[in-house]
């Protein structure tokens, strides 16, 4: 993993930016004069469980321990962080390998249901053996909280702060955890929206955040709803729209799904009883 020294990043002097690289670009008014710009890095990341490669994802090369934990939880590979004995991030010849040591019980379960998913890039259909596995049932979520929509405004304003790479490249998605008082407990960014969410879910499990809601800078696909529900997230806010399958899954698993989140604006798709003004 490389850390790049940035002399000037859109008025940020002497900044340090991980997950971006410089490249020569041209603009219409200076086609013969190259200029330096910053691009978000995208690398293959292999998740390897007890020595067996399970999945390869395209991702930003940062916060990969959080990603491994979040992915393991959101895919039902583990039930709690205690099921993982160790995580080791290693550079490989063509990307990065994340070596994950699972408990014997969880690894046995993974081998039983293991499916061919090589090359998956966040698509929930890729590598699934049968169409019946799409939108698989998730245990219904309990109703344990009420969240004030007035607290969403501050979170939307602060979401950009999570995207350090995105601010200089325009090329990342963000996922943040909103505490009940509207402050951001933490957040993650990645070139892939599903990976950004998995990183957040990993951070949430590690930090023990319970009450509150997840906020993503992208649309809400069914897989993002399913991942959230698998991790016990009761409320998911998305800056863009939700798909019809995402709404169906959210309805079935009792997740409150809200899209088109802007200051003073929101579209509530499911279970509005968790929300207040």
UniProtKB/Swiss-Prot annotation:
Record carries keyword Cytoplasm: yes
Subcellular localization: Cytoplasm
Gene Ontology cellular component list: cytoplasm
InterPro entries membership: Cytidine_deaminase-like, FdhD
Example of a GO biological process term: Mo-molybdopterin cofactor biosynthetic process
UniProt entry keywords in alphabetical sequence: Cytoplasm, Molybdenum cofactor biosynthesis
List of catalytic residues: 123 (cysteine persulfide intermediate)
Disulphide bond pairs: none
GO MF term set: sulfur carrier activity; sulfurtransferase activity
Pfam families with a match to the protein in the record: FdhD-NarQ
Family affiliation: Belongs to the FdhD family.
Protein function: Required for formate dehydrogenase (FDH) activity. Acts as a sulfur carrier protein that transfers sulfur from IscS to the molybdenum cofactor prior to its insertion into FDH.
Stated name of the protein: Sulfur carrier protein FdhD
Organism: Pectobacterium atrosepticum (strain SCRI 1043 / ATCC BAA-672)
